[in-house]
Design a protein with these regions (language model features):
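Extended, regular secondary-structure scaffolds
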Residues: 211, 223, 232-251, 374, ...
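His/Glu-based metal-binding/catalytic segments typifying zinc-dependent metallopeptidases
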Residues: 40-42, 49-51, 162, 166, ...
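Non-catalytic terminal extensions that flank enzyme cores
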Residues: 1-47
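M16 family metallopeptidases and their MPP-like homologs
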Residues: 45-55, 81-129, 136-148, 174-199, ...
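Active-site His/Glu-centered metal-binding helix of metallohydrolases
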Residues: 62, 66-70, 578
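Hydrophobic, small-residue-rich alpha-helical packing segments that form membrane-like cores
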Residues: 150-219, 225-243, 247-275, 282
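Generic recognition of flexible, low-complexity loop/linker segments
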Residues: 94, 210-214, 273-276, 333-337, ...
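Non-catalytic, conformational "gating/processing" segments within enzyme and secreted inhibitor domains
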Residues: 158, 210-242, 723-758, 948
């Protein structure tokens, strides 16, 4: 890395980052005091962020509201929402902003050099020169504002952050995590809610909000990060000339103060809301939490990641199993959290009872004492190290650029030591150290010091309370009524005028001359050719093998699929249960805890799932697969496949005790998943009213699946024999050679060895049954239900769905563009900006299945009516060449997300299973790049046909759904 003519910067360190095959650079901008860290390498997926240390001084949510609002226009880019303009019109591979308890970061990523520079420019201008000082209208809709429609109407509060946090404060898991931080750090920033407490957000004044930005959004408080293949010197010069050189360093103390250690543990009991139908028994959360050292202790940082696995995280881990065996809670979670300056280790029993608190604590102490006395299981320690190291080496973060994850990890040390941004991103020497310590008593010493004899601890109990949300709403209504009574007639008229003015402001589009200031690529900057499919058809005996040949860095990725499209409808939820038990029960050679260790020592993971693949050219047909996934180093493949054989063929499903534990744990985890993804649950349910594909997904992972799991949990003793018989029969029916097909990602040189292992597995499956070669789908009766599912949330998830193919329409690439237009224009403006919902999504599948859904939405009927307005919006849709190009670029950005080998293989295999070839994918891309606004208008009737079906499903606040019960055919409790 050549650094010339950079007198504006002081080079603090330049060093090789060998583990990342990169070069590291640490700088300080001399004039402004800005900190800069660079990881330079040949990765074209470039990453930039600027972050600030933003310690919250109260729980009004000011750091969070600023994060939302600085991206609502700036000096150089004065449009109302540059963030949305970039989403619609850039080739970004990541674009967002994130608020943490003590920091806020603004990251972007792109593989296109020009686009990357454009993104950097908009973000730098946003954080340093935001329009929040010019327009109070920016603060109100994103943060909070009072609304008054008429003199006789009640005053209400609305705001995107306000509603987002109302949703967060309805979740037991979120409430618990918040109280854990409050309990352990009463004297520093972690005791405050940086996201905002809905009861405190209304207290934030516009002046305090601006003051927070003035204080903390200065270069001397900034952390600037660059990653990837770029001209680093050119980027540094640009930052200096355009922004940093305009500032003088100032005295600013934003350091996070360490919490003084406790002399003895503290105890806290709090409440969280449940619906009127949910039981208070078995719904308490018990937690024991400890502050574990210092984030700048590099060895401790990873050592506790390993102890997390060995003590708590692994199936059958001693803390988890002892608490389950003692009858305390249905699921034991927690572990090591390194997101704070002083990391935290938590042990949490979910679905427990307050009366078990002393037993909970005594069991923990007993287990920890035994671990120190008898020693931690060495295999468990090795498995924990191997699993952590495999994740580190593979660096597979899904759709997130790995450079972004490295950058966030830099802040784990950099935020507290200006000279140490790379402390935790270089880790291989620490893994070697930890392996050497397995037999030395090192880990036992850590347990003794930090978990057994550590007074800086807390016991946090959160108990359920029916009607808590109703109480909160009643208190808020009284507070707002009192506020209204305190206003003079003139003030009431002014509030009505302010409400009207804000709505007018929200409806006014940004001037075209301002929109033109947002930098944008041209259509010719986009690649015309679609990404290839990597499907080479091969055979292993009579079994089809789809080989996705590519460089995979010595890792083999296998998907073993079993065609179960002929599965009886009544058995579908049991398929969902089967995927959760395989790998988590005893087998012929291993106890389930030993099995987990073997999997983590020899592989990067073995997992089971169900896959639904509707055929894109035969709407009535689809593939339904039971899938087993394995990833492993090529050298470990024989051991990995032997473990897979062991799981498939010898799992002891008849172990009633273990099966009981899994069912209880599964119920708890499905409920937690529902709380975090109500939009997905609602949209899947709405689709299941008419779509076979969605019905199968819903039956194996949605509300129908949950209802079976809950019933089994409550009546296990009566139903266990039938459950075991059903699962054992299913295993013998599914795992036969005739059903099997294999997807393999590996290099050509490794394929022969892979094929030998496939042959090994085929020989060890259950004997062939008489199976009709062309397995047919069973008869299925689908019906509209239009359900409302009531829960303890303070917000709603409103879903509408339908299928356009049933009405004679066919898929077109313009639907990809419509997703961008809906998500960031029509739905964004009406559901989020005006309505106050945190999010809104839409999807148009090739088989015709379509949905619209809102996320953490204060509204219900209003949102449903907004959906009905889409055809009218499309009928009048107009976009000039620049605007249309913007939508197309945003669409291509979504289509061209960089993929690792595993993701490329998955994309290719999905295409194969759905009957898609490269010509189909290229046709879609051509339609996208060549689209006009006329093509978008042409979708009006297609969308109208979907909405005319009137398929509705809503998950949300009990009182809100009851008050609008006429919208539903059925009103139910989500949990009982």
């Amino acid at each position: 890395m050549k650094l010339t003519d950079l007198d504006a910067y002081e080079v603090l360190e330049q060093c090789p980052l060998r583990d990342l095959k990169s070069e590291g650079l640490v700088l300080r901008h001399k004039k402004s005091g800005a900190r800069i860290a660079v990881i330079s390498n040949d990765d074209d997926n470039k990453v930039f962020y600027i972050g600030f240390r933003t310690p919250a001084e109260d729980s009004t949510g000011v750091p969070h509201i600023i994060e939302h609002t600085v991206l609502c226009g700036s000096d150089k880019y004065p449009v109302k929402d540059p963030f949305v303009e970039l989403v619609k019109g850039s080739l970004n591979t990541f674009l967002n902003a994130i608020t943490y308890p003590e920091k806020t970061i603004y990251p972007v990523a792109s593989c296109n050099d020009t686009d990357f520079q454009n993104l950097m420019s908009v973000y730098m201008d946003a954080v340093f020169h935001p329009n929040i000082y010019k327009h109070q209208e920016i603060f109100k809709p994103e943060g909070r504002h009072y609304e008054l429609e008429s003199e006789d109407a009640p005053i209400t509060i609305n705001g995107v952050v306000y509603n987002e946090m109302k949703g967060a404060f309805s979740s037991a898991d979120d409430v618990l995590q918040r109280e854990i931080l409050n309990s352990l750090f009463p004297d520093n920033t972690y005791s405050n809610e940086s996201g905002g407490d809905p009861e405190r957000i209304p207290d934030l004044t516009y002046e305090d909000y601006l003051d927070f930005h003035r204080r903390y959004y200065h270069p001397c408080n900034s952390y600037i990060y660059l990653y990837g293949n770029m001209d680093v010197a050119e980027k540094l010069r640009w930052m200096d000339e355009e922004y940093l050189s305009h500032y003088e360093e100032i005295e600013l103390d934003s350091t996070v103060k360490a919490q003084k250690p406790f002399e003895k543990p503290v105890e806290i009991t709090k409440k969280y809301p449940i619906s009127s139908a949910e039981p208070e028994e078995d719904n308490t959360y018990l937690s024991y939490n400890l502050v574990v050292g210092d984030i700048l202790d590099r060895k401790l940082y990873l050592a506790f990641d390993v102890l997390d696995y060995a003590l708590l995280g692994a199936p059958g881990a001693p803390l988890k199993q002892a608490l389950i065996d003692a009858g305390i809670g249905k699921d034991i979670v927690g572990g090591y959290d390194s997101s704070t300056m002083q990391p935290v280790f938590s042990i949490i029993a979910k679905n427990a009872n307050s009366a078990d608190k002393e037993k909970f604590l005594a069991t923990i102490q007993d287990v920890l004492n035994r671990q120190v006395k008898d020693g931690v299981d060495k295999k468990a320690l090795l498995a924990g190290i191997s699993a952590s190291e495999f994740r580190y080496r593979e660096a597979d973060f899904g759709q997130f650029p790995k450079g972004l994850l490295y950058g966030i990890q830099c802040l784990d040390s950099w935020l507290y030591d200006d000279m140490q941004p790379f402390m935790h991103v270089e880790a291989l020497d620490t893994y070697r150290f930890l392996r050497e310590q397995v037999e030395t008593g090192y880990f036992e010493t850590l347990i003794e010091k930090y978990l057994l004899h550590n007074p800086h601890a807390s016991v946090v109990v959160i108990e359920p309370e029916r009607g808590l949300n109703a109480k909160r709403e009643e208190t808020l209504a009284e507070k707002l009524a009192a506020y209204k009574d305190s206003l003079s007639k003139e003030e009431i008229k002014q509030l009505i005028a302010d409400t009207k003015h804000l709505k007018q402001y929200q409806e006014e589009p940004s001037p075209k001359e301002d929109l033109a200031k947002i930098p944008m690529l041209k259509r010719e900057d986009m690649k015309r050719e679609a990404a290839p499919l990597y499907n080479t058809m091969k055979k292993c005996g009579d079994t089809t093998v789809v080989h996705h040949e590519m460089f995979s860095n010595g890792i083999d990725y296998l998907r073993i699929l079993f065609d179960i499209r002929d599965m009886e409808i009544k058995d579908l939820p049991y398929v969902g249960i089967l995927k959760y038990i395989l790998g988590y029960m005893d087998t012929e050679r291993y106890g389930f805890s030993e099995l987990a260790n073997e999997i983590n020592i020899h592989t990067g993971g073995i997992s089971a799932s169900c896959g639904v693949y509707p055929h894109v050219k035969k709407p009535e047909d689809m593939q339904f697969m039971f899938e087993l996934r394995v990833k492993t180093l090529a050298s470990e493949l024989p051991q990995a496949m032997d473990l897979l054989r062991e799981i498939i063929m010898t799992t002891k499903i008849s172990d009633e005790k273990r099966l009981r534990e899994i069912i209880a744990q599964l119920r708890s985890r499905v409920e937690a998943a529902f709380d975090g993804s109500g939009h997905s649950v609602a949209s899947m349910r709405a689709l299941s009213y008419f779509s076979r594909a969605a019905y199968y997904q819903e039956a194996t992972a949605g509300i129908s699946f949950y209802e079976l799991v809950a019933d089994l949990d409550e009546h296990f003793n009566e139903k266990k024999d039938a459950l075991i018989a059903q699962l054992e029969k299913m295993v013998q029916t599914i795992f036969v050679p005739e059903r099997m097909i294999v997807s393999v990602v590996c290099e050509e040189a490794d394929y022969q060895a892979v094929e030998a292992q496939i042959a090994f597995l085929l020989k060890n499956l259950y004997p062939s049954k008489k199976i009709v070669k062309e397995r047919s789908l069973p008869e299925l009766h689908l019906e509209k239900k239009n359900e409302g599912f009531m829960d303890a949330s303070q917000v709603q998830y409103v879903a509408r769905a339908g299928n356009y193919v049933r009405h004679g329409f066919s898929y077109h690439g313009a639907l990809r563009i419509l997703k961008v237009i809906m998500g960031y224009d029509y739905l964004w403006i009406n559901v989020r900006v005006k309505g106050g919902a945190y999010g809104c999504m839409n999807s148009y599948m090739r088989n015709g299945d379509t949905y619209f859904v809102s996320y953490r939405d204060p509204n219900l009927k209003k949102t449903d009516e907004i959906y009905d307005g889409i055809p009218q919006y499309l009928a009048h849709f107009k976009a000039d060449e620049r605007e249309m190009t913007k939508y197309i670029i945003g669409t291509i950005s979504d289509m061209d997300t960089p993929m690792n080998p595993s993701a490329k293989g998955a994309r290719s295999m999905t295409a194969y299973l759905q009957g898609l070839d490269f010509a189909d994918i290229q046709k879609e891309r051509d339609q996208v790049i060549g689209a006009t606004d006329e093509d978008i208008r042409g979708l009006k009737d297609l969308i109208a046909s979907v909405l005319e079906e009137k398929n509705l499903c809503v998950i949300g606040n009990e009182d809100n759904l009851k008050s609008q019960s006429d919208m539903f055919m059925q009103l139910k409790n989500l949990y009982e």
